[in-house]
């Protein structure tokens, strides 16, 4: 059974929302490029020039003999760079890029991006733009099945989202801990409820396709574990969580991201699990790609955050990424 603890609204009321990018068009119907700047931090970093850039645009035909035909909406995460350029200057340069898109496959369907345009202000992001990048197609594309293979494709940027990294120290994405399990431990998870503005894009289905204006996602923070062969009580874990002084914000890493900062005292074991960092980042691109795509241009805000305390999944429970059928002896077995 899970024990649930509600955080006070003051933990996210300052930076727990993201403004929408509302589509604007020219007289001929083409989308007008726009830029959105998000700052989920405290602003205590001395050097304020670090930023994360996330591009949104249209995957379209690149046939010079015919008008471009839009295939689907997509994104391109450029990552972190250091720049003093104005957002409008960066937007102008990204809209002039000639970004080629190619559909391929590995373990799953993927999209390959590479740029053919010389860089100026975007030089801090030259590695991903000039050497190319490969992404899981479902993470960066609304409908990869609409992208043809017999027609050259390009990625035309129409929106740019900039996330300023203004917190001091490092932003940690605790990937190594997300599947960590321990006997007699209590898993510390967070259940986040978002309110989504359904009027951002008229005619677009609501979250979950059920006419709802709210959506939830869950993240794993770490485990509370005793040295003795016993588990902590839920009340004791709640006390430890309260002492951490957690503050939450929404950012634009990978589309939409949850940022957590501990302003209080953290359990030594949990602090070690998180790499001795107190500023954490959870991109929805990795956690819930379907919800992340829904939020690409929408306005959203945190309306509730709950700490969910659950028994850590026993190590005897195997985690299956897939199911393999073995019929070597004429019998089907699930391995």
Curated annotation (Swiss-Prot):
Record key words, sorted: Viral envelope protein, Viral matrix protein, Virion
Record localization: Virion
GO biological process terms on file: virion assembly
MF (Gene Ontology): structural constituent of virion
Superkingdom field: Viruses
Residue pairs linked by disulfide bridges in the UniProt entry: none
Keyword ATP-binding part of the UniProt annotation: no
Pfam families: Matrix_Paramyxo_C (PF23765), Matrix_Paramyxo_N (PF00661)
InterPro entries: Matrix_C (IPR042539), Matrix_N (IPR042540), Matrix_Paramyxo_C (IPR055413), Matrix_Paramyxo_N (IPR000982)
GO CC terms, sorted: viral envelope
Function: The M protein has a crucial role in virus assembly and interacts with the RNP complex as well as with the viral membrane.
Record family assignment: Belongs to the morbillivirus/respirovirus/rubulavirus M protein family.
Protein name: Matrix protein
The gene coding this protein: M
